[in-house]
């Protein structure tokens, strides 16, 4: 199985339905024996430029390990979901489990 990093920008009005939406995507990944190595909810953030007249989006990152057919099903599901403003799927060489730079910066802001 291959490793991937997935970043989603979700419509800010859909933050309430986020758990159900991500549960559906988790099911697609784990259906064929895939694993989620890291999941981070970056929360609502300012966009660099407006997308569909929106200035904020809810960001989510997860690192997964799954077969190619599960990834194709996941990408198709993401493509046809109107709540997903942007998506990025990158193949990685290995599972990444340490906190991302975004999460580290969030921890510094809280302190």
Curated annotation (Swiss-Prot):
Q: Name one GO molecular function term.
A: structural constituent of ribosome
One GO CC term of this entry?
cytosolic small ribosomal subunit
What keywords would UniProt list here?
Ribonucleoprotein, Ribosomal protein, RNA-binding, rRNA-binding
Gene Ontology biological-process entries = translation
Q: Which Pfam families match?
A: Ribosomal_S6
User: Where is coiled-coil annotated?
Assistant: none
The cross-references to InterPro entries, in alphabetical order and at most eight, read: Ribosomal_bS6, Ribosomal_bS6_sf, Ribosomal_S6_plastid/chlpt, Transl_elong_EF1B/ribsomal_bS6
Q: Which Gene3D superfamilies match?
A: 3.30.70.60
**UniProt family annotation:** Belongs to the bacterial ribosomal protein bS6 family.
General function of this protein: Binds together with bS18 to 16S ribosomal RNA.
The molecule here is called: Small ribosomal subunit protein bS6
Organism equals Francisella tularensis subsp. holarctica (strain LVS)
Q: Which gene encodes it?
A: rpsF
């Amino acid at each position: 199985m291959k490793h991937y990093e997935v970043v989603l920008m979700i419509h800010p009005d859909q933050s309430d339905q986020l758990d159900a939406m991500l549960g559906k995507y988790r099911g697609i990944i784990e259906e064929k024996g895939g694993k989620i190595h890291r999941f981070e909810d970056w929360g609502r953030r300012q966009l660099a430029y407006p997308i569909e007249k929106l200035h904020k989006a809810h960001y989510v990152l997860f690192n997964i390990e799954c077969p190619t057919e599960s990834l194709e099903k996941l990408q198709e599901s993401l493509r046809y979901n109107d709540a997903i403003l942007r998506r990025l799927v990158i193949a990685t060489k290995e599972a990444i489990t340490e906190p991302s730079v975004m999460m580290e910066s969030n921890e510094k802001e809280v302190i």
